[in-house]
């Protein structure tokens, strides 16, 4: 079940405060955040936010298409090593 519409989207208050300060000053700095659950709002468009993935901060440039999604969706926490080669399994003999 999703969040109630009367509450509005969750955005970390400190992150939103930093975004608003940068918008007033007209600056474009990278903002570090650990708040992966924060919703991307239109005020964030054009900023680069470094989202923590458990190991390091991944820079994410916010575009209009991302509005309504969560910051954590763009900073993967797991590394995909790839599927096994089919050629490696062909040489095995079934018993």
Curated annotation (Swiss-Prot):
Gene Ontology cellular component terms for the protein in this record: cytoplasm; small ribosomal subunit
Keyword terms, alphabetized: Ribonucleoprotein, Ribosomal protein, RNA-binding, rRNA-binding
Pfam families per the UniProt record, alphabetical: Ribosomal_S19 (PF00203)
Origin superkingdom: Bacteria
Keyword Thylakoid recorded: no
Gene3D superfamilies: 30s Ribosomal Protein S19, Chain A
Listed SUPFAM superfamilies: Ribosomal protein S19
An example molecular function term from Gene Ontology annotations: structural constituent of ribosome
GO terms of biological process kind: ribosomal small subunit assembly; translation
Role of this protein: Protein S19 forms a complex with S13 that binds strongly to the 16S ribosomal RNA.
Similarity remark: Belongs to the universal ribosomal protein uS19 family.
Name of the protein in its database record: Small ribosomal subunit protein uS19
Source organism: Thermosipho africanus (strain TCF52B)
């Amino acid at each position: 079940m999703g969040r109630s519409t009367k509450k509005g989207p969750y955005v970390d208050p400190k992150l939103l405060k930093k975004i608003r300060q940068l918008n007033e000053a007209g600056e474009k700095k990278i903002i570090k955040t650990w708040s992966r659950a924060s919703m991307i709002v239109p005020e964030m468009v054009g900023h680069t936010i470094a989202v923590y993935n458990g190991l390091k901060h991944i820079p994410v440039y916010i575009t209009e298409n991302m509005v309504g999604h969560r910051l954590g969706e763009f900073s993967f926490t797991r590394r995909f090593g790839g599927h096994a080669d089919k050629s490696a399994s062909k040489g095995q003999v079934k018993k």
